[in-house]
């Protein structure tokens, strides 16, 4: 199987390429990134897809600067919405499957019943980043003829995403929603907390951490493994092995404050902290206050807890001098 990964130099893309190169089923791994794959170029997707003719494309490329998206919503829609549709249309034309990576920010976060969001729950993005990613989901579904409710429920009802959804004329499509991604490369939430904690310790100040934003910290390495497992299964069930909307996150939930305190515990940094509400933290983009996703069944089983994943990740980080 020939598998292409967009955004191959990013946090998730790096983990995907690394994982795929160790998989026997992936005969060839195509790592696509700038300048060859450019989300701002309408012809970029077709040019690559038609030339390489992959069996599956994992579309991990995105503009994930949520504040930048809020300040430039037109650019966000171009990169995270329109570009997804262009990739999906190119893949359909050559009969390639597509895995589109999406976000928990397609939900408005106003849920008050304490239940996690399921793939079949109504969406309502609270910010331009989420709106653009949701537009990308819809564009991909339109290209693949997967606009019905049965597609949204396929991953949940089939046990591991192995159920056909009544559209045999097109290849398989998976939308993988995730949340709060951390891992190398790049500065992620744990690294930002470490930097802020060291600065607070040096200056003798208190760290202020948001306590009413709840989500699912997810390790890029674990997310990549789950996506690769879905691709591995894609040849089963008559070619519909990964159809549907999948929620893929590490097990468990946390507030930003709880996540930060676990980071500080692992780093053995003792600084005073203060919980503050989101309303006091000024930023261009408003995240969903409740962004917890209910994981859908996966071929290799549920992901480990976010605490376990974070502990492993810490072994890879440079130690404080």
Which residues does each PLM region occupy?
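Rossmann-fold cofactor-recognition segment
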Residues: 30-41
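NAD(P)H-binding glycine-rich loop region in Rossmannoid oxidoreductase-like domains
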Residues: 39-81
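NAD(P)-cofactor binding segment of oxidoreductase domains
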Residues: 71-99
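Catalytic helix-loop patch of NAD(P)-dependent Rossmann-fold dehydrogenases
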Residues: 78, 82-86, 108-155, 162-176, ...
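C-terminal amphipathic/interface module of NAD(P)-dependent oxidoreductases
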Residues: 269-271, 286-321
């Amino acid at each position: 199987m020939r598998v292409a990964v967009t955004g191959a130099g990013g946090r998730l893309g790096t983990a995907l390429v690394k994982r795929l190169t160790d998989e026997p089923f992936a005969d060839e791994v195509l790592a696509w990134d700038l300048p060859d794959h450019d989300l701002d170029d309408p012809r970029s997707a077709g040019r690559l897809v038609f030339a390489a003719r992959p069996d599956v494309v994992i579309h991990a490329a995105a503009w994930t600067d949520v504040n930048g998206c809020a300040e430039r919503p037109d650019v966000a829609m171009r990169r995270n919405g329109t570009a997804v549709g262009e990739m999906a249309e190119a893949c359909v034309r050559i009969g390639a499957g597509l895995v589109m990576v999406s976000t928990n920010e397609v939900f408005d976060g106003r849920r008050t019943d304490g239940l996690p969001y399921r793939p079949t729950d109504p969406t309502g993005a609270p910010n331009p980043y989420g709106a653009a990613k949701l537009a990308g989901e819809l564009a991909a579904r339109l290209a693949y003829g997967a606009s019905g409710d049965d597609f949204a429920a396929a991953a949940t009802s089939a046990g591991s995403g192995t159920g056909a959804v009544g559209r045999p004329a097109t290849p398989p499509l998976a939308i993988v929603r995730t949340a709060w991604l951390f891992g190398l490369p790049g500065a992620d939430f744990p690294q930002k907390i470490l930097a802020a904690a060291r600065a607070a310790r040096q200056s003798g100040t208190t760290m202020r951490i948001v306590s009413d934003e709840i989500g699912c910290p997810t390790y890029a390495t674990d997310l990549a493994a789950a996506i690769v497992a879905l691709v591995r299964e894609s040849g089963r069930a008559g070619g519909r092995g990964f159809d549907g909307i999948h929620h893929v996150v590490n097990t468990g939930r946390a507030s930003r404050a709880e996540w930060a305190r676990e980071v500080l515990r692992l780093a053995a940094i003792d600084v005073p902290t203060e919980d503050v509400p989101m309303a006091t933290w000024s930023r261009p983009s408003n995240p969903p206050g409740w962004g917890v996703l209910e994981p859908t069944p996966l071929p290799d089983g549920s992901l480990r807890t976010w605490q376990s994943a974070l502990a492993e990740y810490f072994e890879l980080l440079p130690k404080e001098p």
